[in-house]
C-alpha cells in the first residue's frame, strides 16, 4: 500500500475537510470538472477530466478557476437570491448560484467513470483526455492515471501547454496516445508578457515530441491584440520548420465568455476585448 500524506488547502478554500492527497511522492490534483461526450478534445467521443492548477497566468484564460490548485467557491451574483439561511452548499442551492471548483477523485474512480462510456469510444475511436489547468504540473500522478487508463483499454490524450520539465515529457511518452499541445506565441517576450512564462522550455518540449514521432494536434489560440498579427504567421513558420504539418495545426477562435467566472471567483478580469484579429 502506498503511503498517503494529506495537506490542507487553507481557509481560502472555504471547505473544511477538503484535502489534497499525496500518494507516495506524486501530487494528486483536485478535479475542477469532468465532461462526458466531448468531441473537441481529441479523436472520437471522449471523457475529459480537468485538473486544477496551472503555472501559467494567461491574460485571456477562459477557465480562471483552473489556475489555483486549491478548491475555490464561486458565487454567481446574477443567480444568487441572498437567502438568509444560505448554507454555502452547492448541492442544495436552489438557483445554482454556488459552485465548488476542485473536488478529490481517486484514479480508480476516474477510470470507472470513463469506462461508463467505453462503447461510445469503441465505436468512434475515442477515449480519455486529461486537461487542465496544466496536467503536467502533476506529471507523476498523470503517468499513473494514464497507465491505469491504458490497462483498462482506454485511448489517452493529453491537453497541455508543455510548460514542464523535460523529465515529465519523457515519462508521459509511453502512456500517451495523442498529444494536444497549445502553442500560445512564437515571440518569447510576447509569450512572457501575456502568460507570465518564457516559451523556451515549451519549444524544446514540442521539438522532443516531434523527434519522438508522436501523434499530435497543435492548438493555436488567436487572441486579438495579443497573439494576432505577425505572430500568427511566425507560429506557423516555426511549426513547419520543426516538421509539424499544417494538417496537424488548428487555429482556435478567442471568446471572452468567461468574464462572469472572474467576478464569481472574486478575481480581476484580465480578458482582452473580443474583436476581429489582425492577420498580416
Regions inferred by a protein language model and the residue ranges of each:
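Short, charged low-complexity linear segments at domain edges
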Residues: 25-45, 55-73, 253
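Auxiliary Fe-S-binding modules of radical SAM enzymes
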Residues: 6-17, 24-41, 210, 222-280
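Residue-level marker of structural boundaries
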Residues: 12-15, 67, 119, 178
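Cysteine-centered iron-sulfur cluster-binding motifs in ferredoxin-type domains/subunits
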Residues: 46-61, 73-96, 102, 134
Amino acid at each position: 500500500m502506498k503511503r498517503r500524506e494529506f495537506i490542507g488547502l487553507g481557509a481560502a478554500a472555504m471547505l473544511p475537510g477538503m484535502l489534497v492527497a499525496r500518494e507516495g511522492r506524486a501530487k494528486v490534483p483536485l478535479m475542477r470538472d469532468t465532461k462526458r461526450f466531448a468531441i473537441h478534445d481529441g479523436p472520437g467521443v471522449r471523457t475529459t477530466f480537468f485538473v486544477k492548477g496551472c503555472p501559467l497566468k494567461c491574460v485571456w484564460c477562459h477557465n480562471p478557476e483552473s489556475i489555483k490548485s486549491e478548491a475555490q467557491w464561486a458565487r454567481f451574483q446574477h443567480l444568487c437570491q441572498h437567502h438568509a439561511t444560505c448554507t454555502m452548499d452547492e448541492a442544495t442551492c436552489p438557483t445554482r448560484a454556488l459552485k465548488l471548483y476542485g473536488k478529490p477523485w481517486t484514479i480508480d474512480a476516474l477510470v470507472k467513470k470513463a469506462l461508463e462510456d467505453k462503447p461510445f469510444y469503441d465505436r468512434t475511436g475515442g477515449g480519455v483526455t486529461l486537461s487542465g489547468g496544466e496536467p503536467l504540473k502533476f506529471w507523476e500522478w498523470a503517468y499513473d492515471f494514464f497507465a491505469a487508463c491504458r490497462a483498462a483499454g482506454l485511448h489517452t490524450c493529453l491537453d497541455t501547454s508543455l510548460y514542464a520539465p523535460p523529465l515529465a515529457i519523457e515519462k508521459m511518452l509511453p502512456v500517451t496516445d495523442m498529444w494536444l499541445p497549445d502553442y500560445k506565441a512564437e515571440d518569447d517576450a510576447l509569450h512572457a508578457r501575456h502568460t507570465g512564462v518564457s516559451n523556451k522550455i515549451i519549444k524544446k518540449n514540442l521539438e522532443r515530441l516531434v523527434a519522438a514521432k508522436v501523434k499530435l494536434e497543435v492548438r493555436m489560440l488567436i487572441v486579438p491584440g495579443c497573439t494576432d498579427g505577425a505572430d500568427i504567421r511566425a507560429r506557423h513558420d516555426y511549426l513547419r520548420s520543426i516538421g509539424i504539418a499544417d494538417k496537424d495545426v488548428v487555429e482556435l477562435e478567442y471568446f471572452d465568455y468567461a468574464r462572469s467566472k472572474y467576478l464569481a471567483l472574486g478575481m480581476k478580469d484580465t480578458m482582452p476585448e473580443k474583436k476581429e484579429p489582425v492577420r498580416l
